[in-house]
Structure formats: C-alpha cells, structure tokens
Swiss-Prot record:
Alphabetical list of HAMAP family matching this protein: Ycf4 (MF_00437)
Gene Ontology biological process: photosynthesis
The protein's name in its UniProt record: Photosystem I assembly protein Ycf4
Compartment(s) of residence: Plastid, Chloroplast thylakoid membrane
Residues in the signal sequence: none
Membrane topology, from the record: Multi-pass membrane protein
Keywords carried by this UniProt record: Chloroplast, Membrane, Photosynthesis, Plastid, Thylakoid, Transmembrane, Transmembrane helix
Gene: ycf4
Length: 184
C-alpha cells in the first residue's frame, strides 16, 4: 500500500511476512519433524509412524542421519518463524517535499539496532538509478543515488517487477523528487 499527496510520498515495504515464507516455514517444519520422528523410531525400534516399519530403517547410519537432518531442519524452520514473527525487512520510505527530508525505516533483528532509521535531505539526492539485468536470472532493482552515501536500494532484490513496472515506479519517483533517472 502506498500513499501520495502533493508534498508527501509514503511507500510501505513488505518484510518477511510473505506467503512464500509462510509456505517454506511450514514445509520445512513438517518435513524436518518427519525426519526426526523416523530417526527416533529407528532408535527406539518402535513404529512411531505407521508408514515405515522400524525394522526397515537401521539406526546406524540411516537413523542417525535422518535425526540430524530433522534437528537441522527444525533449527532452520525456527529461524524462518522468528524472522516472520519479527517481520524483518518491513518498513517504509517517506519522501517529504515540504520539509525537504527523506526517511527510510526498516525493522531488523532484535537487539540494539532493531530499528533502522535513515534520514537524508532531498537536495542530496542526485538521481534515481535503475539496474536491469536480463537473462536466466533477471534482476531489476531501483536505487537512489545520494551525495557522499552512494546508492541506496529502494526495492528488494527478490521483488519480481516487470520492466514496465520498475520503469513506471522510477519515472514517478524521479518526477516527484525532481531528479534525473539513470539506467545501468
């Protein structure tokens, strides 16, 4: 969701609370739980899951490996669930022509620097830069070139924007900020 007026442009940034992250976290959790249960049932010699008889899977080496994969998968799954619950990467970009200030806010991982807040003067923005790479792994990223700071990405690298969408977004933002567009 974006909000625009004559003097203010606010663009909300989606963080890690995306449908794909929810799906991967669920799949990884259920798969690793299955591996751990099969490894445990091979160790105990009892059928905890009725799909595989425990005699078919020996504890050494298959049961140990499956237990290890199950534990590793649970750790990775818990990491994904934590990033989803903390909503890492979400935030907003706020451009205020009236005050002449641009603000970037993102949520990070818990700790001292959880809130990432950057402020720049609009007069320091040199250009809006588009990086477009086509091919097997296309990459379309929008950057903002700032004096003394370099390029700051405005779109996520995993955002699948069509060339028309990124071009339109760059043109609208450059028009709003009254800066040129560079294409790389």
């Amino acid at each position: 969701m974006n909000w625009r007026s004559e003097h203010i442009w606010i663009e909300l940034i989606t963080g890690s609370r995306k449908t794909s992250n929810f799906c991967w976290a669920c799949i990884l959790f259920l798969g690793s739980l299955g591996f751990l249960v099969v490894g445990t049932s091979s160790y105990l010699g009892k059928n905890l899951i009725s799909v595989f008889p425990s005699q078919q899977i020996l504890f050494f080496p298959q049961g140990i490996v499956m237990s290890f994969y199950g534990i590793a998968g649970l750790f990775i799954s818990s990491y994904l669930w934590c990033t989803i619950s903390w909503n890492v990467g979400s935030g907003y970009d706020r451009f205020d022509r009236k005050e002449g200030i641009m603000s970037l806010f993102r949520w990070g991982f818990p700790g001292r620097d959880r809130r990432i807040f950057l402020r720049f003067f609009l007069k320091d923005i040199q250009s809006i830069r588009m990086e477009v790479r086509e091919g097997l792994f296309p990459r379309r990223v929008l950057y903002m070139e700032i004096k003394g700071q370099g390029a700051i990405p405005l779109t996520r690298t995993d955002e699948d924007l069509t060339p028309r969408e990124i071009e339109q977004k760059a043109a609208e933002l450059a028009y709003f900020l009254r800066v040129p567009i560079e294409v790389f």
